[in-house]
């Protein structure tokens, strides 16, 4: 697991937690952001909030000192995807993603679009299999593989295209680290502290289990954003993760 990264704001963020800002209201999302420390996590902006509020919302988070994962899962023809990824880089986001199922030409074009940004380029990762999907869902779209098999196949393709890592289930993390190496970044949604509502996720793990599986970054939403004390909930998760790391 990545122990820390130096942020564009000159600080170190030791936490692997990315908090999903799954709101439908900008004021509510910013009120949440104002309750937590940018050194304790990063923030994920997804399709709903970005469609509602656009780049200005990302700018407001940057002004508060947060690094942003722009989770728009681009999946289009190579040129369109490349231009979208470059636009994300222009916004100064920390991480952006595409769908690995877009294929080699699309992912390669996206990676090449970031070359002019050098060390300032965001991390570029690809989505393998959505954590809401089970084998029956894959069969329904003509893929005769288990989620783990499909995730491994797409992770290898992603790495061959030069991307930084993948979004995957924590259940696939150990195998993907084995086949893609320790430096290949794994970002996992479907992380729920013990006792949390699993929502619409199907393949989930606790933060502690995710660390032991080799996850680099974990996306956690409602257990933090809907907590009575979000800052305390985030601190508790970070402490539990640190305890596992220190015990290794």
Curated annotation (Swiss-Prot):
Any GO BP annotation: 'de novo' UMP biosynthetic process
UniProt: substrate binding residues: 22, 44, 71-80, 131, 192, 201, 221-222
Keywords of this entry: Decarboxylase, Lyase, Pyrimidine biosynthesis
GO cellular component: a single term: cytosol
SUPFAM superfamilies listed in its UniProt record: Ribulose-phoshate binding barrel
Top EC group: lyase
A Pfam family matched in the record: OMPdecase
Recorded metabolic or biological pathway in which this protein acts: Pyrimidine metabolism; UMP biosynthesis via de novo pathway; UMP from orotate: step 2/2
UniProt EC number: 4.1.1.23
Example GO molecular function: orotidine-5'-phosphate decarboxylase activity
Catalytic activity: orotidine 5'-phosphate + H(+) = UMP + CO2
Enzyme active site: 73 (proton donor)
Function field: Catalyzes the decarboxylation of orotidine 5'-monophosphate (OMP) to uridine 5'-monophosphate (UMP).
Subunit structure and binding partners: Homodimer.
Family of the protein in this entry: Belongs to the OMP decarboxylase family. Type 1 subfamily.
Name of this protein: Orotidine 5'-phosphate decarboxylase
Protein's gene: pyrF
